């Protein structure tokens, strides 16, 4: 989830390069040594920049407007910079709310603390980063030459991107996590794609190299003990900008050769995951105004309690929610496919936290698939849950008794389905026992088409 998109590079890609991309990019490193390029500048990284810049420009189709700056920092200095971002007021508030939502949905253990987990991930992963505020690429001192080359190559792409789009403004977006995830996936995905293209060549990528790289990226987590033992939702959210983002960029270059993806970025995880949502159906590419955009959903104020946070899940995070208790990729994919906009709110009540989640769907079939899978999800999440309402009732109220062995209090869950115009609206209210009824009025939910 992409809670702090700029941290993701430091958290994951460094070690992933070590375990995955070093062997794959060996030809790039060797070729660099055999075919020296003119140095860029006169600093300690002049030769490295001379080798890497042309390859990055060729792989992205963009040229540097100004020469990038590289500086060395100690591991402690890099850690301090990243931890400052992690503990900033905005980041801390966002992380705390996300943690409460994840606990309510059973995506992380009740006693989990995501802040120290991210700190440990930082300590495991730090190699380098690009800071858009200072326009400088920082690398950790005493890094092995092959790791340095790969780190610089990846982060040079971010430096190049920052000369064409405002990375700072992308990172500062709030209130629509799904859109922020889509943007971050393009930034990280283009960097991964550029690395692979620089090392393997475009032909190799198209002839199965990309599929092998995808598998290798996932296998690489075996060498990252902190990462591999993190909750599934954390692992997948950190991986997605790299794997899912690079996968989209790979498809984009095939469907729209010569076009700059930074100037026409997807705005939702659905557009990343579904060719039809972004490119359109068939071989031709639809105009931007003909794409499938998520409908903004606005929730009314709850009848009681206080809204702590409100955001979006989108298709990708909806998949993760379902997958946690129904570990079948096809089932989770079908459940989330067709979501056309959503909004959740975390409501703080005296009895405990409640979650209100409204989602609009393309059609009744896809909404029914989601409701069916979510019903199964409820049974897996709360084995003793039950409902007296008919299976096909538009509103079903579920009661989950307390489970002292697992430290769970009794819960009430309401699943409500209605039609707005031609599209179904699904409203889920998960609250402490007896508090779900009337917490939100579905009739006051606004869908902006």
Model regions: which residues?
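Active-site recognition of the HExxH zinc-binding catalytic motif
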Residues: 56, 150-167, 191-192
């Amino acid at each position: 989830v992409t809670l702090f998109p700029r941290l993701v590079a430091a958290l994951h890609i460094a070690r992933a390069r070590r375990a995955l991309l070093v062997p794959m990019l060996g030809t790039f490193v060797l070729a660099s040594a055999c075919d020296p390029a003119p140095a860029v500048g006169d600093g300690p990284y002049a030769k490295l920049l001379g080798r890497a810049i042309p390859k990055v420009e060729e792989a992205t189709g963009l040229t540097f407007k100004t020469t990038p700056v590289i500086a060395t920092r100690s591991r402690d200095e890099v850690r301090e910079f990243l931890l400052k971002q992690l503990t900033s007021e905005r980041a801390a508030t966002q992380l705390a709310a996300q943690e409460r939502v994840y606990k309510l949905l059973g995506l992380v253990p009740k006693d989990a603390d995501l802040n120290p987990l991210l700190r440990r991930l930082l300590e495991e992963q730090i190699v380098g980063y690009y800071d858009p505020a200072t326009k400088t690429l920082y690398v950790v001192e005493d890094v092995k030459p092959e790791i340095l080359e790969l780190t610089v190559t990846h982060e040079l792409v971010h430096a190049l991107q920052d000369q064409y789009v405002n990375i700072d403004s992308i990172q500062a977006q709030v209130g629509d996590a799904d859109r922020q995830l889509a943007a971050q996936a393009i930034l990280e995905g283009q960097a991964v794609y550029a690395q692979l293209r620089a090392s393997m060549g475009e032909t190799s990528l198209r002839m199965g190299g990309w599929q092998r790289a995808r598998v290798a990226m996932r296998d690489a987590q075996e060498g990252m003990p902190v990462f591999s033992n993190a909750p599934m939702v954390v692992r997948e959210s950190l991986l997605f900008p790299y794997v899912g983002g690079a996968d989209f960029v790979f498809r984009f270059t095939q469907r729209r050769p010569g076009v700059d993806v930074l100037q026409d970025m997807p705005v939702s995880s659905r557009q990343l995951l579904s060719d039809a949502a972004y490119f359109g159906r068939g071989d031709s590419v639809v105009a931007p105004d003909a794409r499938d955009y998520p409908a903004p959903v606005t929730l009314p104020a709850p009848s009681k309690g206080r809204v702590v946070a409100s955001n979006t899940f989108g298709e990708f995070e909806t998949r993760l929610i379902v997958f946690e208790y129904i570990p079948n990729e096809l089932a989770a994919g079908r459940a989330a496919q067709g979501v056309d906009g959503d909004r959740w709110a975390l409501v703080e009540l005296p009895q405990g936290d409640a979650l209100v989640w409204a989602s609009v769907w393309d059609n009744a079939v896809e909404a029914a698939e989601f409701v069916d899978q979510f019903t199964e999800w409820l049974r897996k999440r709360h084995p003793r849950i039950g409902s007296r309402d008919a299976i096909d009732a538009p509103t079903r109220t579920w009661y989950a008794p307390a489970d002292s062995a697992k430290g769970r209090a009794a819960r009430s869950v309401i699943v409500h389905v209605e039609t707005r115009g031609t599209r179904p609206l699904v409203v889920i209210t998960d609250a402490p026992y007896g508090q779900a009824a009337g917490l939100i009025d579905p009739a006051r939910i606004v869908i902006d088409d």
